[in-house]
């Protein structure tokens, strides 16, 4: 029994130290151009074969990391399920309010002390981060070419007493519409929430067509 406890403690400490050190590398988040079917996409860390930042937690944003926002996109940062940042202006930005401090940012002494405090916090979670930070990109371009139509003819009675008309007809309706996300914050809060990778318009089109 003692051996099992000791192994658990060693593993937790190793996980806490290793995970925290891996998360010290600054990230660069970006989102490739989204096609007309994608409404929301989770931000990806830019890595290459030469990158040393390959073991960090996917849901941790290190202090000082870069975040790029392209035209036609809106970016939000979600921490512990709550939106803490939103940006709809294109350009590159630096994340400097993270509660996951980096030894590569700010005052070296302060950052190191905060990092060791973070290691202590992770130890209480068995070596895991105990934190969730995500970057989401919203497609703010107009989503066009959405077709709709009545699945069955709609019966309709036409009556005109002046000419003695009283007939039953069947009416069909079809067309094309477009829409766009005008408030990404409300869309995240009320519609998509946290998504693993992408939220596509197929997930909402049925509801939209029903309301027609």
Q: Each predicted region: which residue ranges?
A:
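N-terminal hydrophobic membrane-entry segments
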Residues: 2-212
């Amino acid at each position: 029994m003692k051996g099992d406890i000791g192994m658990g403690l060693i593993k937790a400490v190793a996980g806490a130290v290793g995970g925290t050190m891996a998360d010290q590398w600054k990230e660069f988040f970006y989102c490739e151009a989204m096609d007309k079917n994608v409404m929301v996409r989770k931000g990806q860390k830019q890595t290459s074969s030469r990158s040393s930042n390959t073991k960090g937690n996917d849901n941790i944003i290190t202090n000082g990391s870069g975040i790029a926002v392209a035209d036609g996109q809106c970016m939000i940062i979600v921490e512990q399920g709550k939106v803490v940042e939103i940006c709809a202006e294109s350009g590159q930005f630096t994340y400097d309010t993270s509660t996951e401090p980096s030894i590569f940012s700010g005052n070296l002494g302060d950052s190191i002390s905060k990092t060791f405090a973070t290691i202590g916090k992770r130890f209480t979670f068995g070596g895991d981060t105990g934190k969730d930070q995500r970057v989401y990109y919203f497609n703010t371009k107009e989503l066009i070419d959405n077709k709709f139509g009545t699945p069955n003819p709609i019966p309709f009675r036409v009556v005109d007493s002046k000419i003695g008309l009283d007939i039953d007809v069947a009416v069909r309706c079809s067309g094309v519409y477009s829409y766009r996300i005008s408030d990404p914050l409300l869309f995240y809060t009320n519609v998509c929430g946290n998504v693993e990778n992408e939220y596509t318009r197929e997930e909402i089109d049925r509801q939209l067509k029903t309301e027609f």
